[in-house]
Amino acid sequence: DRIGFVQRVYDDGSIKSERGNVGNAVIYGIESLVDFNLNELFFKNNDINFNYFINFSLIESEYTKSMEIGVEGKKVEFVPSVNIKTGLKYGYKNFSFNTQLSFISDQYTDSSNANEGNLSGVIGVIPSYKILDISSSYKSKKYGIEIGINNVLNNFYFTRRATGYPGPGIIPSPPRNYYITLELKI
């Protein structure tokens, strides 16, 4: 049994999303993390740390049985088919620099797999998106500092649709933002 959202049409012509037992679903896939220590291949220097990483998942999902009309054979909501995170980590002695690129494929927000949203913004596809983050840090035995930028390319994206407060509607994700972290060891 899979709990999710189903669209209901009422006598007055209105369509509302209701949460309930959608039906039986199968979800399967593969996830992998590969982390290469490039220092071992190229530099052979203990002061340098240079890594490339990639984490990816490929997931298939499908409703196999449902009492709801038009649900069987549809993808399960909030299950992107592709999720990739890749990046480089470079460090020299106490300094480090990190970059990460994330890609999430499109996904549905309801069991009908509606591509187009309605006026409320509650149903519809969540489009695929890419996010680039970078950070740099310095750490010593007594203190550390880290600075970073999330969503460097300032991409517009969203990861969910709200059915209640503060919605209903699309909840946008943050634009480019900056942070700084100070660390003191006592």
Predicted regions and their residues:
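C-terminal beta-signal and adjacent terminal beta-strands/loops
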Residues: 1, 39, 50, 103-115, ...
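Short clusters of hydrophobic/aromatic residues that line enzyme substrate/ligand-binding pockets
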Residues: 3-4, 22, 76, 157
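Transmembrane beta-barrel architecture of outer membranes
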Residues: 81-85, 131-133, 175-179
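Short, basic/aromatic-rich helical patch in the C-terminal catalytic core of site-specific tyrosine
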Residues: 88, 134-137
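Extracellular loop and loop/strand-boundary signature of outer-membrane beta-barrel proteins
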Residues: 15-22, 68-75, 118-124, 165-170
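Gram-negative outer-membrane beta-barrel transporters
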Residues: 18-112, 181-183
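Structural motif
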Residues: 91-92, 126, 139-140
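Flexible, solvent-exposed coil segments and beta strand-coil junctions
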Residues: 7-16, 63-69, 109-117, 158-163
